[in-house]
Regions:
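Charge-mixed, compositionally biased segments that are often intrinsically disordered regulatory tracts
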Residues: 1-73
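Generic enzyme active-site microenvironment
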Residues: 40, 82, 124-125
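Basic nucleic-acid-binding interfaces
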Residues: 41, 98, 121, 147-148, ...
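Short, solvent-exposed loop/turn segments at secondary-structure junctions
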Residues: 44-46, 85-88, 127-130
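A short acidic (Asp/Glu
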Residues: 50-51, 132-137
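Electropositive, glycine- and tryptophan-enriched low-complexity nucleic-acid-binding patches
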Residues: 59-119
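Acidic/histidine-rich, metal-coordinating catalytic segments
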Residues: 118-132, 154-158
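Short mixed-charge
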Residues: 142-166
Length: 166
């Protein structure tokens, strides 16, 4: 008998969460006309930044384009992408050498600041820890004019644990 240890247990409210997200996607076009923005966010980490060591040689009559195999390494980058749910197009992209809580918060803050005419933002993401970090929760509460006690990280309130922030 096999037991999978990386697959999380089925959540009792999973179907309700999926229905909420699907409902949001269905309403996105109509609500966008009312000044709301819907974007899906995801990351691509560890992307190698490479540069060809020598320029390509162009095609010539009877010869194909030629490319040398050697390249120069410039480390790796982490990308954060926002896709507009209504249009399906790339709305924003951030490329940095790291992807941490501060990077994600700066990405969200930059996105919101870039379009001040938007009345309400809806960001759809997975539950990666940086997507539900203390700094992001505090920023969202501040931007939403929520006058509530968020509690203390690791001790009480909304900030008590990652699951209480999801």
């Amino acid at each position: 008998m096999n037991r999978y240890w990386l697959t999380p247990a089925y959540e009792a409210d999973f179907d309700a969460k999926v229905a909420d997200i699907n409902g949001l996607y269905k309403q996105a076009s109509e609500l966008a006309k009312q000044g709301q923005r819907f974007e899906s966010i995801d990351e691509m980490t560890g992307v190698r930044a490479l540069e060809r060591k020598h320029p390509d040689l162009p095609m010539l009559p009877g010869k194909v384009e030629r490319r040398e195999f050697e390249y120069v390494r410039h480390g790796t980058l982490a990308f954060i992408f926002n896709f507009d749910i209504v249009t399906g197009k790339l709305a924003a992209c951030t490329a940095k050498p790291t992807r941490n809580e501060q990077d994600f918060l700066a990405h969200i803050q930059g996105r919101v600041a870039a379009e001040p005419q938007i009345d309400q933002w809806h960001f759809v993401s997975d539950n990666l820890n940086i997507h539900i970090s203390e700094s992001l929760v505090r920023y969202v509460a501040e931007e939403s004019d929520l006058d509530i006690d968020l509690g203390v990280k690791g001790k009480s309130g909304v900030l008590e644990s990652l699951s209480s922030r999801a």
